[in-house]
């Protein structure tokens, strides 16, 4: 997305820069959390709340990239089959594919934070 923003001359916009940074941070967090879950599973340990945290992080990263693509690309993002279209469709289904985000957050609250179930 940064390359596309640069091509469109949007890197002077502080709001775009902020959103690019946020999206990158969300992607990096999702990547690291996913590696942590893979490591836990590779060691033969039981799944932990880290699994739900990684799922929520991945969903948040997908949504951030999808929304950013729509903002940077403007109307061309709506072209069927474009990068932005494909990414946004992935982002919209990501939360459902890994379990509703609300369910994941409830599992995190109960398992990781020790909060009562809703």
Which residue ranges define each predicted feature?
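Alpha-helical interface subdomain recognition
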Residues: 1-118
């Amino acid at each position: 997305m940064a390359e596309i923003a640069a091509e469109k001359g949007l890197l002077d916009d502080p709001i775009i820069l902020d959103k690019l940074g946020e999206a990158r941070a969300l992607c990096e967090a999702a990547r690291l959390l996913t590696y942590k879950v893979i490591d836990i599973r590779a060691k033969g340990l039981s799944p932990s709340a880290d699994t739900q945290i990684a799922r929520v992080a991945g969903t948040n990263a997908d949504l951030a990239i999808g929304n950013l693509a729509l903002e940077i690309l403007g109307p061309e993002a709506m072209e069927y089959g474009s990068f932005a279209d494909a990414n946004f469709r992935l982002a919209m289904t990501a939360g459902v594919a890994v379990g509703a985000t609300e369910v994941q957050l409830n599992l995190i609250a109960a398992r990781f934070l020790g909060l009562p179930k809703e």
